[in-house]
Amino acid sequence: MKHRWIRIVGAVVLVGAPLPTIFIAQTAQTAAQTDQAPGPYARIAIMRALDGHSVEWEAGYIRHLEWHRQARDTFAWYSYSVWASTERQRWIIYATFGRTAAELSNPVSPVEDERDNLINVLPHAQFLGNAVYEFLPALSRGNGVPTPALRAEYTTVELTQGTGKAFEAALAAEQSKLQGETLWYRMVVGGDTPRYVRLRPRVSLAAILDERADQALPDKVNGLISKMTVETLNLRPNMLVNVTPEPARQ
């Protein structure tokens, strides 16, 4: 597509003709998509390589992501490996953020996507969860689409029934104190509710550790929580689609 547009522009320069209508329309559409605010939903899923299949799984997953590129999937796909965890070390969290309900309802070529998944990924992996979350801007600092930093802190919070509103109100009251990118999402479908996840992208593990005092939630929500897990993630630069990782910093 890029080379075709270059030829069109070159032809206009040479002959002095007006820009073709299709070029103007495509340019306007691209600009509109770039300026459009992110949608409110994220799809977050998790899988792990079967025992003894790590090499085959990684190669197959990378081939599957290449299928998404060839299919011109417009979604931005993130992949993180779980680094610090008591239960999920080396598992992969893959996700897309800033989506609308209409976009999630119309993924690229779903039949072909599933076929390629069955060939390249499923023989070597176990899928362990797939959920849709809603971004909560009143609790967060950021726009719901995480900066693709090389590290991230990932917190999962499960609440007792009927306490979601009180939990959100308590976090919203502390929102102005947030110092760095902090993204909260509420599970909509895909598991036991109420469940929330917090994602804090950071440039390094040192940054996460240096900000550990900010990790704690307000004391007033302690009685609402049935389980809370804090893990750290590594962004996988070779497992991204339409995402450019932030450069490493010394």
Residue ranges and their predicted role:
Residues K2-V13:
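Bacterial N-terminal signal peptides that target proteins for export
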Residues A25-Q250:
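Short S/T/G/P-rich N-terminal loop/turn motif that feeds into the first structured element of a domain
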